[in-house]
Regions:
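An acidic, low-aromatic, low-complexity terminal/linker signal
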Residues: 1-171
Length: 171
């Protein structure tokens, strides 16, 4: 076997193993999603969000979280889903996203937080190909847990187009 084949095989194993771990799962409509717990800083109930002019519609504005201004993105709108009224289960998941060398605290509005799951690599499959026209690089993979499908997200990529706007809001 060539060294390249061995290195590629090691890389594939490392990638699969690196996806295993604890995920905070949450709902958007009838779909379940997961984000690595290590990115989550806290979960807060829905609160008043101060709108910011001239931002995309999915950027809801900012909140004052214990003296720190946190930009808030409605993940439902970011994904192009129909807007829904917020309920008592709607909450903001405060996450830390990577932008180059810096980290930005952001709030992500979700319909409901479900649970923290320890997902093993055997429960995670690669993201299927949906053709060239659909972008899936924001998905880490698809988990099958307890008979249900969970789409594992890479919020760094989901929110990458927003971080420039949100950094400006944050400053």
């Amino acid at each position: 076997m060539s060294a390249t084949v061995v290195e590629n095989a090691k890389s594939d194993v490392t990638t699969a193993q690196s996806l295993a771990g604890k995920y905070l799962t949450f709902a958007l409509g009838n779909e379940e999603y997961g984000e690595r717990v290590l990115k989550v800083r806290e979960i807060i109930g829905m609160m008043d969000v101060t709108p910011v002019p001239q931002v995309p519609p999915h950027v809801k504005g900012v909140v004052n979280l214990r003296g720190k201004i946190i930009p808030v993105v409605d993940l439902r709108l970011k994904f192009g889903f129909e807007p829904q009224p917020y309920t008592e289960r709607t909450c903001i998941v405060v996450v830390q996203v990577q932008r180059g060398d810096s980290r930005i605290m952001m709030g992500v509005v979700v319909d409901a937080v479900s649970e923290v799951l320890n997902i093993s690599d055997s429960e995670i499959e690669d993201t299927p190909s949906f053709g060239e026209e659909l972008q899936t690089d924001y998905m880490l993979g698809i988990a099958k847990v307890k008979g249900k499908i969970k789409i594992l997200l890479d919020l760094d990529r989901v929110l990458s187009s927003d971080t420039t706007v949100l950094q400006a809001v944050n400053n």
